[in-house]
Amino acid sequence: VRFAWQSRDEEVWGKYGYPTYGVGLYSGFLGDPEVFGNPNAVFGFINFPVSNPSRRNQFAIEPSLGLTYNLEPFDPENNPLNDAIGARMAVDFDLNFGWAYRWTPEMDLTYGIDFSHFSNGRSFTPNWGLNMFGVNVGLRYHYNADQRRTYKGMYPEEKLQSRYLRSEKTPNEKVADNQSINVYLALGTVQTEEGAGTDTRYGTFSLVMDYHHKFYNLHSVSAGLDYFVDNSLKETYTEGDGENSLVGIHAGYDFMFWRLTTVLHGGTYLTEKLGKDDFFLRPAIRYNINKWAYAQVGLKTIGFAADWVEFGVGFRPFRW
């Protein structure tokens, strides 16, 4: 179940094709409920239309992010069969590639394919996560909130248009101050596989310095250096004689909309890997507080598996 608002401001949203955005609720099942629970989720989403506004069958890309709850976590005594999730709550990420067929002036028939992922980023172990691919079919109802304010009653004198007549996407624009040096600091906490089901935890630290270049108002790239501290390595990589820090390099792509930025870094290590894979990824969500500072939540990975969740702040000390 989802509730959405239609964007209209040409200056802010026109360049993104006038997306809709909102909140939703999810309830589902994952095999044996005594092992995995019956997951429910609360999430936010944004729907980016791709098709020409004149087409009756519209294609859109819709990412969503939220929290899943009502899970049954791993317990060595009471729930040893659950080797996927070690916490009662997890992050819920979903990516939907969908179509909407304009059935009536108020109703759409929606259908698509989606990918969903539940994970807690090794904040608790085990954390193999849960991945789900599926198809979806639904109905979408459009209504105009001004109708009840302007023309009240069961038989209004005039019926306002329910469906928003979306305009063509406005051209991308180059932005001023399109280059910067960014400094990002983040903390995290992890469990090891040996510590699953216990209160034993280890702290992590990330320091990132990169060069950031914006091509247009939507797209940018970055490249830079990473410094990591993972205190769990003292337990998981005994050959390192207590070493717990790594240095790496990365390159990345950003997609920017409103004050939010979706970030994807890919990198490798310049120093000894200390038992980690050859490469790491960093998918993240960034909120721009102002031109000089931002808050960011991301996931640092080991290859394609979660390493730890980063909670941090960033600064742009140099912009030009």
Each model region followed by its residue ranges:
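Residues that define the transmembrane beta-barrel architecture of outer-membrane proteins
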Residues: 1, 17, 36-42, 57, ...
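Residues on the lipid-exposed face of transmembrane beta-strands in outer-membrane beta-barrel proteins
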Residues: 1-5, 44-50, 63-67, 95-101, ...
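Transmembrane beta-strands of outer-membrane beta-barrel pores
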Residues: 5, 25-31, 65-73, 115-121, ...
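Repeated loop/turn-to-beta-strand initiation elements of outer-membrane beta-barrel proteins
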Residues: 9-12, 59, 101-109, 145-149, ...
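Transmembrane beta-strands of outer-membrane beta-barrel proteins
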Residues: 19-23, 59-65, 109-113, 135-137, ...
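Solvent-exposed loop/turn segments connecting transmembrane beta-strands
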Residues: 29-39, 55, 122-127, 195-202, ...
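Outer-membrane beta-barrel "beta-signal"
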Residues: 131-157, 306-320
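Detector for outer-membrane/organellar transmembrane beta-barrel domains
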Residues: 176-265
